[in-house]
């Protein structure tokens, strides 16, 4: 079928219309007085959410070109979510503001490529300034406050995260489960997380989130490659009879064996997943032993005379829950306290004996994974709709706390970006010229957009509030919850620097794609075939 081709200004304006629709749908959720969005579902009850990236994923427009604009900005939100775990609404609002300002200049005859260069240079300047303004966080209460702000200023979330951090430390793993009651509860259990995910995406049990979640699984831990199907059968058969899932951790699984596991998983014969072993060399073997001890199983290794093809069911480890993503695996086990404590003491002795700071650091990592545990937040709610919304908010909060630990915190509520506007203008005017300068000034005019929207959602005049904020000290901003100007650090209104930086970088990157677009090629939907003739009328037929 012939394709539709749209050029230059018409193409960019069509993309802009899609971006306008997406940005408005997402922006209503921004700030402490942001509204919820109701998502209609084809099957099941509607979903009520306050999460930018979730809303963005649901928006599909009838016009293909406009929908392409939606898809571009959706990528900015998704990328920010992947990198920082939060800041998706900020990224969307920023990208929208850049596109609006940029297209105005392109329509007036500015060179889009030179504008992009100016925007790129402005991005690098702003990223450096954000890092300079960031403060490191050590106190668990300060870290928890970051999570509360991310979850919409929810005090229950703040208390929950503070308690979790106190119990398992700021580097701890905090995971979410759906609870059985109406109250949200915190439970700290023995657990371990390592940075290896499933070998094949076909192992994912939740296609929407691309996660494999197994309750009460068996765990086979092997320090060798698994090449043959015959090696797997003696393990697969008894596990299938037991009716429980199986997770295999091995150095690698070759094609034939992997195909067998995938086929069994897809046919529903056995709920199974395979994960590559973490670490390298001797350290890999030690980490596999840690996993085996944590789950009450045995490491299948030829050094101990054990092979996969003669492994019994009682040699396998057992876990309460295992969650696997494409990048990581979290094991929650219980009931093996004595063996775990003995292993922890053994690692501590090794740390005392070693003189290498590198080895000591790696031993410390293993110690933290074994003894730190996993904090499990069991999300409770009166209805399923409320639970989904609460879970998304808690997920944002946990991601925000991790980001805060990594790169520190900056004043929240759009303050940082608004205050950087005069700094960027001064730098650009002294450093850049011509259309590169115009590109940087486009960014400067767009930076207050998140603050303006937060103020507007609180019933204030966004432009007036933004101008008043620029006149004040860097840490002072508009508190939309109380309609007052306060010191954001003192008031505990802070954002992770990583979230602010990622939102800025991704918004500017994807906005530049729209500005530099010259042509859009669209494949129209095929028209319905004409109905066949009636009686002997000799109507048209499609062959």
UniProtKB/Swiss-Prot annotation:
PROSITE patterns: CHAPERONINS_CPN60. SUPFAM superfamilies: GroEL apical domain-like (SSF52029), GroEL equatorial domain-like (SSF48592). GO terms for cellular component: cytoplasm. Its EC number is 5.6.1.7. One of its GO terms (biological process) is protein refolding. Residues 533-543 have a biased composition (Gly residues). Gene3D superfamilies: GroEL, GroEL-like equatorial domain, TCP-1-like chaperonin intermediate domain. It is an enzyme of class 5 (isomerase). GO terms for molecular function: ATP binding; ATP-dependent protein folding chaperone; isomerase activity; unfolded protein binding. PANTHER family: 60 KDA HEAT SHOCK PROTEIN, MITOCHONDRIAL (PTHR45633). NCBIfam families: GroEL, PRK00013.1, PRK12849.1, PRK12850.1, PRK12851.1. HAMAP family: CH60. This is Chaperonin GroEL 1. The gene is groEL1.
């Amino acid at each position: 079928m012939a394709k539709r081709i749209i050029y230059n200004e018409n193409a960019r304006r069509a993309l802009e219309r899609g971006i306008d629709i997406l940005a408005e749908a997402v922006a209503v959720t921004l700030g402490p007085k942001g509204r919820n969005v109701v998502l209609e579902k084809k099957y099941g009850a509607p979903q009520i959410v306050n999460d930018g990236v979730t809303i963005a994923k649901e928006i599909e427009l009838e016009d293909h070109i406009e929908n392409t604009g939606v898809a571009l900005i959706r990528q900015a939100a998704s990328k920010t979510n992947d990198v920082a775990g939060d800041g998706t609404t900020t990224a969307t609002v920023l990208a929208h503001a850049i596109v609006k300002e940029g297209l105005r200049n392109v329509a007036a005859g500015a060179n889009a490529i030179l504008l992009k260069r100016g925007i790129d240079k402005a991005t690098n300047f702003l990223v450096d300034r954000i890092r300079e303004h960031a403060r490191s966080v050590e106190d668990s209460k300060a870290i928890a406050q970051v999570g509360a702000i991310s979850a919409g200023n929810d005090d229950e979330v703040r208390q929950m995260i503070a308690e979790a951090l106190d119990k398992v430390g700021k580097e701890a793993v905090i995971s979410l489960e759906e609870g059985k009651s109406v109250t949200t509860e915190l439970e700290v259990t023995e657990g371990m997380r390592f940075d290896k995910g499933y070998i094949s995406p076909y192992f994912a049990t939740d296609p929407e989130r691309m996660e494999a979640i197994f309750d009460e699984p068996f765990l086979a831990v092997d320090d060798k490659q698994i090449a043959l199907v015959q090696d797997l059968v003696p393990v697969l058969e008894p596990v299938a009879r037991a009716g429980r899932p199986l997770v295999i951790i091995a150095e690698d699984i070759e094609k034939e064996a992997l195909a067998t596991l995938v086929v069994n998983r897809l046919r529903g014969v056995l709920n199974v997943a395979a994960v590559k072993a973490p670490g390298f060399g001797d350290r890999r073997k030690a980490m596999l032993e840690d996993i085996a001890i944590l789950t009450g199983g045995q490491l299948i290794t030829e050094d101990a005379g054990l092979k996969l093809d003669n492994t019994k069911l009682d040699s396998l480890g057992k876990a309460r829950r295992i969650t696997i993503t494409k990048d990581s695996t979290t094991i929650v086990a219980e009931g093996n306290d004595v063996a775990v404590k003995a292993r922890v003491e053994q690692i501590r002795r090794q740390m005392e004996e070693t003189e290498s700071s590198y080895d000591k650091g790696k031993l410390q990592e293993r110690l933290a994974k074994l003894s730190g545990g996993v904090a499990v937040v069991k999300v409770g709610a009166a209805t399923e709709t409320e639970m989904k919304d609460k879970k998304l908010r808690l997920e944002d909060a946990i991601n925000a706390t991790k980001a805060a630990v990594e790169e520190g915190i900056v004043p929240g509520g759009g303050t940082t970006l608004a205050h950087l506007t005069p700094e960027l203008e001064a730098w650009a005017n002294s450093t850049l010229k011509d259309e590169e300068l115009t590109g940087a000034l486009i960014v400067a005019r767009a930076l207050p957009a998140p603050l303006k929207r937060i103020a507007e959602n609180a019933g204030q005049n966004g432009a007036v509030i933004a101008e008043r904020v620029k006149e004040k000290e860097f840490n002072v901003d508009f508190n939309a919850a109380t309609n007052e100007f306060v010191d954001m650090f003192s008031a505990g209104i802070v954002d992770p620097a990583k979230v602010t930086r990622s939102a800025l970088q991704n918004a500017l990157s994807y906005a530049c794609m729209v500005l530099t677009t010259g042509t859009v090629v669209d494949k129209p939907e095929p028209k319905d075939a004409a109905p066949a003739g009636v009686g002997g009328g000799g109507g048209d037929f499609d062959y």
